Swiss-Prot record:
It comes from the Archaea. Belongs to the dCTP deaminase family. Keywords: Hydrolase, Nucleotide metabolism, Nucleotide-binding. It comes from Methanococcus vannielii (strain ATCC 35089 / DSM 1224 / JCM 13029 / OCM 148 / SB). Bifunctional enzyme that catalyzes both the deamination of dCTP to dUTP and the hydrolysis of dUTP to dUMP without releasing the toxic dUTP intermediate. HAMAP family: dCTP_deaminase (MF_00146). This is dCTP deaminase, dUMP-forming. Homotrimer. The record marks G132, W133 as: Important for bifunctional activity. It catalyses: dCTP + 2 H2O = dUMP + NH4(+) + diphosphate.
Length: 206
């Protein structure tokens, strides 16, 4: 059962669902809009060897960032021209990880799904790849996987980037996501790189 605007407000007002910060104007008919935070990660790897710790760079923006498609030609001259022309803080090509401003806490009988806003789909920017599902009992900020597929897109800190759709489960989970021993991204308060290498470590322990 998907929660309506009335349900979302009831769950938030009762404290069963926590969204911090919460903005009443971001409640849609059956969703809640979330905003883009200031923290990002780009990887330094030529090849993603998922058995290993992936080298990455973390950074923050003051105002805006330009996301370019992977094969969009960039050099220092072009980057400086973009920065000057569009008054942006940073220019990146290829995929990058971002995060929501919102810290979300779900009870064991509510799960959620993240979807990018359709307005961004219309400029061929995707803000999640495969990680749109949020298990019941999750606590943390939502990490975003951001890719531009056509032309460069400028994103602004604190703008609405996507939405959460909440669903009520038929029965509560025995152990919520953030209480599971093997949960990799529980209680994340910032953008997090892939921790898939832990899958191999856990397999060895078992």
């Amino acid at each position: 059962m998907i929660l309506s605007d009335k349900d979302i407000l009831n769950y938030v007002n009762s404290g069963r669902v926590c969204i911090n910060p919460f903005n009443r104007n971001f409640v849609g008919p059956c969703s809640y809009d979330v905003t883009l935070g200031e923290e990002f990660i780009t990887y330094n790897e030529d090849v993603y060897d998922v058995k290993k710790q992936l080298s990455h760079r973390s950074f923050k923006i003051d105002n805006s960032i330009m996301v370019c498609p992977l094969h969009h030609h960039l050099d220092e001259k072009i980057i400086e021209r973009y920065k000057e022309k569009y008054s942006i803080d940073c220019v990146v090509s290829g995929g990058l990880l971002g995060t929501t401003n919102e810290y979300v806490e779900l009870p064991n009988d509510v799960c959620a799904q993240y979807q990018g806003r359709s307005s961004f789909g219309r400029v061929f920017l995707q803000s999640h790849q495969t990680a749109g599902w949020i298990d019941s009992g999750f606590k943390g900020k939502i990490t975003l996987e951001i890719v531009a597929y056509d032309k460069p897109v400028i994103l602004y800190k604190n703008q609405r980037i996507g939405q959460l759709i909440f669903s009520k489960t038929l029965s509560p989970a025995d152990i919520g996501y953030s209480d599971r021993k093997c949960s990799k991204y529980a209680r994340q308060t910032s953008v997090m790189p892939s921790l898939i290498k832990k899958d191999f470590e856990n397999d060895l322990e078992e």
